[in-house]
Amino acid sequence: MLNIFSLICLSSALHSSSFFFAKLPEAYALFNPIVDVMPVIPVLFFLLALVWQAAVSFR
């Protein structure tokens, strides 16, 4: 069981590390700034929800 779990973790770690260093094809190079900002968007939604709840006094 532990071997399967460690294999899954190792596989996902290797996959994610190659994912972070991947480059867009040359035809889509103009979208690089947008792609760099995209991972931050869920954090912005979380902050928006937090500010919204603070505005209504966390009802």
From Swiss-Prot:
Pfam family, one: PsbK
Matching SUPFAM superfamilies: Photosystem II reaction center protein K, PsbK
Keywords: Chloroplast, Membrane, Photosynthesis, Photosystem II, Plastid, Reaction center, Thylakoid, Transmembrane, Transmembrane helix
GO biological process, one term: photosynthesis
Signal peptide: none
Transmembrane segments: 38-58
GO CC aspect terms: chloroplast thylakoid membrane; photosystem II reaction center
Topology versus the membrane: Single-pass membrane protein
Maturation propeptide residues: 1-22
InterPro entries: PSII_PsbK, PSII_PsbK_sf
Subcellular location: Plastid, Chloroplast thylakoid membrane
Oligomeric and partner information: PSII is composed of 1 copy each of membrane proteins PsbA, PsbB, PsbC, PsbD, PsbE, PsbF, PsbH, PsbI, PsbJ, PsbK, PsbL, PsbM, PsbT, PsbX, PsbY, PsbZ, Psb30/Ycf12, at least 3 peripheral proteins of the oxygen-evolving complex and a large number of cofactors. It forms dimeric complexes.
Function: One of the components of the core complex of photosystem II (PSII). PSII is a light-driven water:plastoquinone oxidoreductase that uses light energy to abstract electrons from H(2)O, generating O(2) and a proton gradient subsequently used for ATP formation. It consists of a core antenna complex that captures photons, and an electron transfer chain that converts photonic excitation into a charge separation.
Family recorded in the similarity comment: Belongs to the PsbK family.
Annotated protein name in UniProt: Photosystem II reaction center protein K
Gene encoding the protein: psbK
